[in-house]
Amino acid sequence: MGRRKIEIQRISDDRNRAVTFIKRKAGLFKKAHELSVLCQVDIAVIILGSNNTFYEFSSVDTNDLIYHYQNDKNLLHEVKDPSDYGDFHKSASVNINQDLLRSSMSNKPSKSNVKGMNQSENDDDENNDEDDDDHGNFERNSNMHSNKKASDKNIPSAHMKLLSPTALISKMDGSEQNKRHPENALPPLQHLKRLKPDPLQISRTPQQQQQQNISRPYHSSMYNLNQPSSSSSSPSTMDFPKLPSFQNSSFNGRPPPISISPNKFSKPFTNASSRTPKQEHKINNSGSNNNDNSNYTQSPSNSLEDSIQQTVKARRKLSARPVLRVRIPNNNFSSNSAIPSEPSSASSTSANGNSMGSSQIMKENKTSRSSKISPLSASASGPLTLQKGNNGRMVIKLPNANAPNGSNNGNGSNNNNHPYPFGSGSSPLFSATQPYIATPLQPSNIPGGPFQQNTSFLAQRQTQQYQQMSFKKQSQTVPLTTTLTGRPPSTFSGPETSNGPPTGSLPSKFVHDLMSNSPNVSSISMFPDWSMGPNSAKPGNTNNPGTFPPVQTAVNNGNSSNISSTNNTNNNNNNNNNNSSNNNSNNGNDNNSNNSNNSYYSNNEDAPVNGAAISEHTTDGDSNNQSNSSTYDAAATAYNGNTGLTPYINTAQTPLGTKFFNFSTDISGEKNSSKI
């Protein structure tokens, strides 16, 4: 079915008339534009609506076109009137809606009229030529749509009375433009705020406006309230005070000169403007004499110096290769033993039997950090030797804690550079246990230090020493200087540092802690739990002989920094479990005594090794030797784990309970880890 043409006559309904006007006006303007473009003609279309509003489309200046229309007599005129299209006639004058003007004095204009004059964008081309039989329905739908937004487009009657028709047209056209541009559709207050300049931007200097392209007034306001003297700082510097800002350097006439003091790298300077509040509080509490730490935002920053310091710190971190020290856990450690948090000191991860010793060690380490000497390694240093005691048994001769530090000449007379910085001169075999600790260690900074030794020479030297020793000939007096240290004694010529055991090449200076003679093959170095006698594997034993009895800490009231290997109570009625052998691979016991220099053993006393009596600590600090009936058979019955032929951690007590493993970052075969 084709379209049915409607009768061209006045539409009686106001809403339908307004909708028809909107659609046909838009189509007329569109056709006029297309005609002007396609045919290169000058067009001016002027419409005076029933709401006393002019609607105009012109491809040229309307006044100029009207001037030529009226005054240029040389231009031809082709005129048409309504009579050319039907039984209509031309009006003699302009029709002004007088009723609308009169009603505007007291009332607003009807919603339909105002709405009808403002919706001219939705018309199409076909509505200009002909109407269809659905015109009535379409007009009703358009009227319903116009009622929703009619209240927003009403013009006050007082304004319509005072404004001229041209002003009314511009006012109605402005409402149409608001629909097209979402920025103009804002509420009046928001639109006014958007047009008004920012007072903070006006008050800022041009230099600050270049630094900050996007205005953030809420950040600036809060920052100015908190820091009135530093209101010129940009919000980026305010939001991230931790990062060094190069913007603040522009406020200085010239940056202060960079002065590198001799102790610059030992205690680097931190610029005040790049400090965090937490760092600032720490510097103020430590009594720093920096004059710029009163307010870290007010003082100007020296960005160049900060960048140099960060570069130096980064290079120092790269040069110091971290080594992870892993300690095997043991369930017999003291529950109140303090775990220190000093990763750069080997003494901080030592096996402390009690919390008092640990706290005292930490205090001593902090006070002596400037001297770079570990208090534990300086308290008792020197090699251990096997000597015959008064009772005819073999004992371990421990170094003298009172001996001053000197060069180690290899004969055991001078006790400098003892390889055990774990606590009071006792090796890890005699130490109590501690919870599982993984601590990064820093290598020693001594040039030509012990970690730069020849690995093949050390391995060959150890093999020769272990071949000379036999498990059955341990009763002989054999100096354990090289056997226990695993290195030539003359290597250490300088004092021990507190940076932990040297790393970087194997074998380490503590590699002997995990090595001892095998019961059957004396030329092969094995783990300490393999050094049990042949009687430990007797068929009558019900328990597996490969493990060790619980290692307990000793009660030592006279010296809080000593690290004991057995936990003997103050009474002399200890059971056999407390009198059993410690983690020494020879099933030996300690003869402990106290001295004023925090040494576990004195120079004049002996420590028994094979079947000797356990020394029992009393509250007075003296020691009493008591006979120990625990032989290999008795010790085997006290063991409750697997045999010593496997070092795996699968029992309650492991022989590796006091051992450390250093895992370096160097991936080079066997050198990627070292046992300490």
From Swiss-Prot:
This protein is called what?
A: Transcription factor RLM1
Q: Which GO terms describe its biological process?
A: cellular response to heat; cellular response to stress; positive regulation of transcription by RNA polymerase II; regulation of flocculation; regulation of G1 to G0 transition; signal transduction
- The ranges the UniProt entry gives for DNA binding are 58-87
Q: Which InterPro entries match?
A: MEF2-like_N (IPR033896), TF_MADSbox (IPR002100), TF_MADSbox_sf (IPR036879)
Q: What else is known?
A: Present with 736 molecules/cell in log phase SD medium.
Where are the annotated segments for Disordered? Answer: 103-156, 173-192, 202-318, 330-424, 472-514, 532-631
| An example Gene Ontology CC term for this record | nucleus
* Annotated Low complexity bias: 284-295, 334-359, 368-381, 399-417, 539-604
Task: Name positions with the PTM Phosphoserine.
Answer: 120, 164, 374, 377
Q: What CDD domains does the entry give?
A: MADS_MEF2_like
Give start and end of each MADS-box domain.
3-57
What family does the Swiss-Prot or TrEMBL record give for this protein?
A: Belongs to the MEF2 family.
Q: From what organism does this protein derive?
A: Saccharomyces cerevisiae (strain ATCC 204508 / S288c) (Baker's yeast)
Write down the PROSITE patterns for this protein, in alphabetical order. Answer: MADS_BOX_1, MADS_BOX_2
- Chief place where the protein resides: nucleus
